[in-house]
Swiss-Prot record:
Lineage: Eukaryota, Sar, Alveolata, Ciliophora, Intramacronucleata
Designated name of the protein: Large ribosomal subunit protein uL14m
InterPro entries found in the cross-reference section: Ribosomal_uL14 (IPR000218), Ribosomal_uL14_CS (IPR019972), Ribosomal_uL14_sf (IPR036853)
Source species: Tetrahymena pyriformis
Gene3D superfamilies, per database record: Ribosomal protein L14
Similarity remark: Belongs to the universal ribosomal protein uL14 family.
Localization in the cell: Mitochondrion
């Protein structure tokens, strides 16, 4: 589960190496977010001379978690890192290519169609 002040790693190729969550969408007293939830992040580490500078506030969607999640068939799924995809508008990713695994829960919630073949 993702809480406020959690360090996350973006998996889209936009030159950002590390971000930190500071707002979770879905209610004023929300404490935790899971896969396919939106959050507001701040950029902490970037590549030099990048078009996304440090301290930029962006919207993101969670794609993988370290915490294990129970699937519909009863099995569990777990990833090594907490990853997000940085967004430009509602559902368009900032980078062109997504690197690494993505949870199948996004396919069930129909987010994959908005990423237009990059997953």
């Amino acid at each position: 589960m993702i809480q406020k002040e959690t360090n996350l790693k973006p998996i889209d190729k936009c030159g950002v190496w590390s971000v930190r969550a500071f707002h979770l969408y879905g209610g004023s007293f929300r404490n935790q977010s899971t896969i396919s939830n939106f959050l507001k992040v701040s950029v902490k580490k970037t590549r030099a001379n990048n078009w996304v500078p440090k301290k930029t506030k962006l919207k993101a969607i969670i794609v993988t978690l370290k915490k294990e999640l129970k699937k519909i068939d009863g099995s569990y799924i777990k990833f090594r890192t907490n990853n997000v995809v940085l967004l430009k508008k509602r559902l368009t990713p900032k980078g062109k290519i997504l690197m690494g695994p993505v949870s199948s829960n996004l396919r069930r919630k129909r987010f994959l169609t908005s990423f237009c073949g990059s997953i």
